[in-house]
């Protein structure tokens, strides 16, 4: 039976009749013995926004903030916190740490005692931050001001990627991998001569066809424009694959990976998303790859309109918000596809 909205009395529920569930309704279920019963409240909630739309919210707009002064930057989401690493024009290295639930970007902490700290190299691996300072691998437990050198003789031109069990670095045109940051081994690549060391970004994503498979996509600048690499991984450890170079050939036309400044790469809604700017400091449309780095299509995902960008940092937090942090203006946006908030 169901409680009547007009009388407040129980009435027999008829499945073939229409029932008003615009407000919570009390439904009573009776057992076959005619004695036992249990009452439930049925509350049907309808999501009234377009599930596939993405709206951007401006979180900060302070041209006097520390992040506005960065000329190089990198953002990471770790747990419920955002870390924005930046370098100022005078070479000072800083980091802004803030909670995603109540984000503030006005003040930064100086990272002191290190020369040539490469903010674009910062990675998070197995509970530690890693970065390069003058080619030397350094690490920190907090990402703030406790950086120390890692005990390894290996020096690097770039830190390339992080997956579940390994961190990857590029040195002298070769790819290296480590499970602990100290012992490094060569990692196989299928093509020589195209490993990027500048303007480099990576992301990882789950395979659409193999529950035990995932992959890393890496992009960066090389002599020919933008280099794109992919490596497949098997979570069971049964198979091993090399890093594969994905040539951005002429026949790709407008779907080739664009040559951008301030490159960022992230995974969102099952696709690989490329963000960046023109050399004049205008944020370009997001480029989406649904074939793991082979082709790139613009404007599949809405993006904020930004100009005057000196450095751009983009990351995705645990709540599926995309954060876009613009140095030069101090503007910060966040946005999320509505249905991802619904837990799809």
Regions found by a protein language model. Give the residues of each.
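Entry beta-strands of beta-propeller and related beta-repeat scaffolds
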Residues: 79-84, 127-131, 165-169, 211-218, ...
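Beta-propeller fold detector
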Residues: 52-63, 103-114, 147-154, 185-193, ...
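Loop/turn-rich, solvent-exposed surfaces of beta-rich toroidal or solenoidal domains
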Residues: 253-290
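Blade-level signature of beta-propeller repeat domains, shared across WD40, Kelch, NHL, RCC1
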Residues: 294-299, 306-344
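Conserved Ser/Thr-centered positions that define the repeating blades of beta-propeller domains
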Residues: 96-101, 139-141, 177-179, 230-232, ...
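Beta-strand-rich domains and repeat architectures in extracellular enzymes and scaffolds
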Residues: 59-91
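Beta-rich interaction/scaffold domains
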Residues: 1-71, 340-344
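Repeated scaffold domains used in trafficking and secretory/extracellular systems
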Residues: 63-76, 110-127, 149-166, 191-211, ...
